[in-house]
Amino acid sequence: VIICWTVTLVHSQEVLSEWENPEINSVNAEPTHASYIPYRSVAEVERGESSMVHSLNGKWKFKYISGIEASPTAFYSVDYDDSSWNYINVPGNWQLQGEYDPPIFTNVKYPFEPNPPYVPKDSNPIGLYRRNFVIPTDWKDEEIFLHFAGVQSAMYVWLNGEKVGYHEDGMLPAEFNISKYLQKGENQLTVQVLNWSDGSYLEDLDYWRLSGIYRDVFLFALPKVHIRDFSIFSNLDTEYK
């Protein structure tokens, strides 16, 4: 009797987290566009104050975790107890605002053992940020966007316990349309910032390695129908003027 065994080899592809997947730079984020501030009137432009923008800069609740695998679960839930968290100034780097991991300066050498697209897990610090806000009363029937001008090096965003999205690129803004996540009255915003991501391999420049929400954070409102992006083109004459 001859027994034939048929062996089927199944190749299982590893599922990478967004922060270790070179094919994913953002999830549910708005497409990159020209930078601008919306205004309701010429008078607002002349004053330099827009009623369509609401700053979220200031004191945020903050929790430092030495490695992403040590991150608490459900920290984004609205009923999660953050009474033991510290406060931190936004914008700002956490290395410069407390006894957290130190700033790192290196030129050619990576600040961690390179194994692209992977980054260390046990030594990849994260910062948990949280703050509450109320939407201005005159923002009715408009699209509401959340703008981060700069976060290093990657982040996840939750609003009122619901996951909004992900973004990595420490030098470019990130925007999310949060209209469907908002509720009447007070809203709770939670952000998880990762020190390292696969983007850190491309951002390995001759400069200080600092982390956190280091540029402005604000909300802005736009009408349902609006200009989202624009470009300006000009031609040069024969003298390149």
Placement of each model-derived feature along the sequence:
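Accessory beta-strand-rich segments of carbohydrate-active enzymes
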Residues: E14-S26, E30, E46-R47, K61-I65, ...
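Short, contiguous pre-domain boundary segments
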Residues: T32-E44
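Bacterial Sec-dependent N-terminal signal peptides
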Residues: V1-E14
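Contiguous beta-strand segments within globular domains
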Residues: L236-K241
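Surface-exposed, low-complexity/disordered Ser/Thr/Gly/Pro/Asn-rich loops and linkers
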Residues: I88, G92, Q97-K121
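Mature N-terminal segment immediately following signal peptide/propeptide cleavage
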Residues: R47-Y64, V78, Y87
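Short Gly/aromatic-enriched secondary-structure transition segments
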Residues: S71-D82, I88
